[in-house]
Amino acid sequence: MKYNKFVFILLIYLSIFMNAYSIEPEIFVQSTVNRASKVLSQDLTKEKKIEKLKIIAEETVDIRGIGFYTLGGARKNLNDVDKKKYAKLFKKYFLKSFSSRLAEYTNPEIDVQNKKILNENYTIVNSVLKETNERPEIKIDWRIYTKNPKNPLIRDLIIEGLSLARTQKEEFASILSSNNGDINSLFKTLENFSKN
Amino acid sequence: MLKRFVIIIFTTLALSSNVVAGTDGELILKKNKPSEIKDCSEKFNRATFAFNQVLDGAIFKPVATVYRKLPSPLRSGVGNSIDNLSNLITIPNNILQGDFAKAGVNTGRLVLNTTVGIFGIFDVAQQLGLDEYEKEDFGQSFARHGIGPGCYIVLPVLGPSTVRDTIGSVVNFTGGDAWYNITVKNDTQYFSEIDYYSSKVTSGVDFRAKNFNAIENLEKNSLDFYASVKSLYLQDRQQKILNTKKIIETQDDSDWEEIENK
């Protein structure tokens, strides 16, 4: 009886403890957006902003996972050395591309509006990038990987229904198909992008 | 000749709608999945794409740059009147897709905005609570009736398309677009060809200006700009055909399972 009581209390304690440290996907998105907005609204050089945005991206995006996802079927033919090389090159490419895209915006206002739990691994968080004089309102959906509730990660951005991960995957497939599936051609393209 | 063409189109539509009487969203989704659409003449398409980029740099981009400097109310007035004109294609397509309620709403929008909204400059209908406007075209109607997209093609000046969507555009010039009929095809006292062509050019400039930063950003950060534009176009068409704002399957989870288990 005493033992049962102890287990019961322990379970309650654990569940409270676990919940206390899990992050709701919509809160995760809003806080990520707030962090990025803060950087973008600061009086910093573009280069400094890019450096800060890269840190945010490294902490909140599943860069390695997206890299291998966007490689499509070609990842099955990679040996361990190539996999390592690709992961490194993709990370460099992604951080540069992601941060320089974001750095173009000054003080973007994003409102998180809703969420839809797809399954225990994924939640879609709906948000809106507010209209400005230069562009209309833009709907942005975030595909959040929630397998580890304490450390949710962004796996895709869906802008007005268009998936960035899917676009990237098709872009990589096109580079590979134009070069007879030679992975080195993709490596070279990624290298060149990061250098320039 | 025109009569024959229209008969062929309607026969095809009728046949396909019978054949796919049991068609559901999933089949349409599958048929229009970007990865399933072949780029049959990629070399030719890439050449046309390069030509369009030169044209964009020489004409559309500079004009859009100036257009963006116009006061915001003026630009939204232009955008509204272009949208209002496009109702003339949207309404018949609402009917072709069996969406009679939307056809009614869009007819209301057209009447209100053309009259009270002064030739569509003001979107009075939106303020009166009518549904948000969504464009429809003949390519979308063909797709709803089960016609597959065919190959991906890039048209000179007009940009990305598919065989089905191109045929859909041809319908506009063969009686499907009332605006074309009263400006170019028939000699009316009130409108002339210049009205039609200037509305089309303005529509292109308005689109370019609205997406100015997005296009520049995409071009700058793409490894293969042609492939990115193709992917985005085909994803967008898939969404429009299904008339959904829901997120269509964006990632294959089996891919992720394989990545995670390694």
Residues covered by each model-derived region:
Chain A
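Solvent-exposed loop/turn segments at secondary-structure junctions
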Residues: 75, 92-93, 131-132, 160-164
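Short beta-strand edge/turn micro-motifs at domain boundaries
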Residues: 137-166
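Bacterial N-terminal signal peptides
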Residues: 7-17
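Early exported N-terminus immediately downstream of N-terminal targeting peptides
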Residues: 24-102
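Low-complexity, intrinsically disordered terminal/linker segments enriched in charged
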Residues: 156-196
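Positively charged n-region of N-terminal signal peptides that target proteins for export
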Residues: 1-5
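Surface-exposed, charged secondary-structure patches
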Residues: 96-138, 189, 193-196
